[in-house]
C-alpha cells in the first residue's frame, strides 16, 4: 500500500510539472527546460589564478563556478558588496575570494590588481574581462551622461585594466602562456546606434588587435560574443521565469550562462593555445540571419 501511495505522489509531482510547462508554453510559446552537456575536464585549470571582473552574477558568476570546479583559484569583482557576498556564499568554496571594485575608476586599477594578487596568493594567470552594464536608451535619445557611464565600464575600464596587467606580464619570463578572455556580445556584430552594442564592437576589435600585439609575448587573447543569455540583464527573460523561449534566434531559446562558461573554460585552457585574437560567437544562430 505504501508503495502505491509513493507511486501516486511521484506521478502527481510529474503531472504538476507537465501542467506547469504546458501553461508556460501557452503563455510564451516556448519551453521551460533544455539539455546542455557539462564537460568534466579533470582539473584542467589546476593551480591557475584567475581574475574575473563582474563576477557576482550571470555569466561571470557561472564562469567563476566552473573555474573552481576545474581546480583554479578565483577572485570575482563587482561594485555591490552584498551581491559579491551572496555569490561567495553560493559558490561555497575556499578557492573563491571577492573584491569590491568599480572598474570605471581608472586610478584604482594598479591598487586593485595588487589586492587581487594578494587574495589569490600569487600572480594572476588569467584575466576574464566580463564587467559590463546595459542602458536601454536608444538613438537619438542617448545623452552624453549615458554614453560616458556605459563606455567607462564596458570599454574604458576593460582597456586600461588589460593594459596594466599585460604590461606586467610582458616583463616576466614564463613557460606557460597568460590568457585574457574578453566577453563581448553578438550585438557587436550586427551594427547598432546605442552605447552598449557599440562598446561590444569595440571589445571585439580590441581582442583582435591585442591578439596580434601580445601573442609574441606569450599572452593569448580571445573573446566570446554571447547571444541573448538568461540572466538578470535580460528583463524579458526574467519576466518569463523558467521559460527559455526566445524568438530571436533559430534555436528559439535563450542561452544559459552555464553554456558560456563551458566555452570560456576551453579558451582558458592549454587546449586552445593556437587560437589567437578570435571572438567566438555563441548566439544560437542569431547573427546568421
Residue ranges and their predicted role:
Residues 215, 220, 275-277:
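Short, small/polar-rich loop/turn modules that mediate ligand/substrate recognition or access, typified
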Residues 35-37, 190, 265, 276-289:
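Short C-terminal tail/terminal secondary-structure segment
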Residues 162, 199, 207:
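Active-site helix of classical SDR
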Residues 56-58:
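Conserved glycine-rich cofactor-binding loop
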Residues 138-139, 143-148, 245:
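Substrate-binding pocket helix/loop in short-chain dehydrogenase/reductase
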Residues 185:
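Residue(s) in the substrate-gating loop at a strand-loop-helix junction
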Residues 1-47:
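Non-catalytic terminal and boundary segments that flank Rossmann-like NAD(P)-dependent oxidoreductase
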Amino acid at each position: 500500500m505504501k508503495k502505491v501511495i509513493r507511486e501516486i505522489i511521484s506521478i502527481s509531482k510529474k503531472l504538476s510539472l507537465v501542467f506547469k510547462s504546458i501553461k508556460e508554453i501557452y503563455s510564451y510559446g516556448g519551453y521551460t527546460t533544455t539539455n546542455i552537456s557539462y564537460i568534466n575536464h579533470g582539473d584542467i585549470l589546476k593551480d591557475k589564478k584567475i581574475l574575473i571582473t563582474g563576477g557576482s552574477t550571470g555569466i561571470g558568476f557561472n564562469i567563476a563556478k566552473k573555474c573552481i570546479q576545474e581546480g583554479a583559484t578565483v577572485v570575482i569583482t563587482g561594485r555591490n558588496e552584498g551581491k559579491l557576498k551572496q555569490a561567495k556564499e553560493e559558490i561555497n568554496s575556499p578557492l573563491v575570494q571577492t573584491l569590491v571594485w568599480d572598474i570605471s575608476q581608472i586610478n584604482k586599477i594598479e591598487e586593485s590588481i595588487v589586492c587581487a594578487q594578494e587574495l589569490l596568493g600569487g600572480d594572476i594567470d588569467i584575466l576574464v574581462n566580463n564587467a559590463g552594464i546595459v542602458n536601454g536608451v536608444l538613438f537619438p535619445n542617448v545623452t552624453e551622461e549615458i554614453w560616458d557611464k556605459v563606455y567607462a565600464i564596458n570599454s574604458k575600464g576593460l582597456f586600461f585594466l588589460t593594459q596594466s596587467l599585460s604590461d606586467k606580464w610582458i616583463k616576466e619570463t614564463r613557460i606557460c602562456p597568460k590568457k585574457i578572455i574578453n566577453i563581448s556580445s553578438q550585438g557587436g556584430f550586427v551594427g547598432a546606434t546605442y552605447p552598449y552594442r557599440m562598446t561590444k564592437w569595440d571589445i571585439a576589435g580590441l581582442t583582435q588587435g591585442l591578439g596580434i600585439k601580445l601573442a609574441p609575448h606569450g599572452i593569448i587573447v580571445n573573446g566570446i560574443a554571447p547571444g541573448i543569455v538568461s540572466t538578470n540583464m535580460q528583463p524579458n527573460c526574467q519576466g518569463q521565469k523558467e521559460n527559455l523561449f526566445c524568438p530571436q534566434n533559430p534555436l528559439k531559446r535563450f542561452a544559459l550562462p552555464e553554456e558560456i562558461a563551458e566555452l570560456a573554460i576551453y579558451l582558458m585552457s592549454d587546449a586552445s593555445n593556437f587560437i589567437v585574437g578570435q571572438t567566438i560567437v555563441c548566439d544560437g544562430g542569431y547573427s546568421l540571419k
